[in-house]
Amino acid sequence: NSIIQQNFDGYEIILIDDGSRDNSNNICKQYAATYPHIIFIEKENEGVAITRNKALNIAHGEYIFFIDSDDIVYPESFGKVVSILTNTQPDFLRYDFNTIDIHDANLYPNHLRKKRKKYHCMVLNAADFMQKVIKNEYYLCMHVFRRDIIDKNNIRFLDGCTYNEDTLFIIQYLQHCSKCIYADILFYGYRKCDEAVTAHFTEKHYNDVKRVYRALSKLATDNNKIQMGKNIQRVAGELALHLHKHVSAKQHIDKEYQDIENDCKQKALSIEWNFKRWLPENLCNIAWELINLIKKIANRL
């Protein structure tokens, strides 16, 4: 409803039922029967990557937005974003969001938004955009993509991956961008719920992050732009930190993770991995906790 009620109508909506077990199928059919610009596809459950790839294969629009089914688009925001797209013709655009509950109420402030404001409608290259605007927020639904760049470079989601697959997709895409723009527009309401696929870190998620780490490391090695390669390595290092937080609960640390940890320490991908390289384990853990606290405080300043 939040999309249909926008003050803009030059778009298509692709709804895909990935084997839902509730009444979603009937609701989607009703929407498709009522609105000619809605395309509805029903299929067996194959996971988020294959589902999104199917949508990309049939999309017709010049620009691609990804909207999760339980989230919302704020009133009149669609037209504002499209106006910027039309006037600036960027390769990549980022808008902003609030994290909301089931009643659409804000859960907590978006502290990084005020840091991004100074880049509103400023043209940046991909490497600068990663550092100054995205930071560590590689959220698929907060960005707009050009379909021709996606198709020309055959960019697709990693099959079977359900955790950090958006990070990999965005970085693959950014390698082909020269004109990135941030729009200081509150466009998206991201609904935080306990039932979400990413709400609890599972063994499947653990293995997915390792897959994404390997893919990012290869992208960084293959990239011939020095700063872009460093940025990609930094993101890979952040993913490895996420792995490390959960690996202590495992009874057996697998060789693949150990190889990732050694890679991060050898490349000194962040200050945390530098500490891990030189400090004893107990001092390293204290240092990591202090760094994490400092980062949280810095984000709120």
Question: Which sequence ranges carry the predicted segments?
Answer:
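Donor-binding/catalytic cores of nucleotide-activated saccharide
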Residues: 48, 69-180, 188-204
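Catalytic core of nucleotide-sugar-dependent glycosyltransferases
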Residues: 185-194, 199-227, 238, 242-268
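Short aromatic/hydrophobic "clamp" motif used to bind/position activated sugar donors
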Residues: 64
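A conserved acidic beta->alpha catalytic loop
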Residues: 17-26, 44
